Amino acid sequence: MARYRRCRSQSRSRCCRPRRRCRRRRRSCRARRRATRCCRRRYRLRCRRY
């Protein structure tokens, strides 16, 4: 959970990290898109799902 706490200081895009499966397919992965949206809109400990 410490990874998401860095979201306040670091960039919003690094706040949410995609699932392990999404790392292989970055472009076609839907989970990564949802994670980035979560960071941009609500980037305060709201990204625990991803």
From Swiss-Prot:
Role according to the record: Protamines substitute for histones in the chromatin of sperm during the haploid phase of spermatogenesis. They compact sperm DNA into a highly condensed, stable and inactive complex.
Protein name (Swiss-Prot/TrEMBL): Sperm protamine P1
Keywords in alphabetical order: Chromosome, Developmental protein, Differentiation, DNA condensation, DNA-binding, Nucleosome core, Nucleus, Spermatogenesis
Protein family per UniProt: Belongs to the protamine P1 family.
Any single Pfam family the record assigns to this protein: Protamine_P1
Domain of life: Eukaryota
Gene Ontology cellular component annotations, sorted alphabetically: nucleosome; nucleus
Organism of provenance: Trachypithecus vetulus (Purple-faced langur)
Disulphide linkage map: none
Signal peptide feature range: none
Cellular localisation: Nucleus; Chromosome
Any one Gene Ontology molecular-function term assigned to this protein's record: DNA binding
Tissue spec. comment: Testis.
GO annotation (BP), single: chromosome condensation
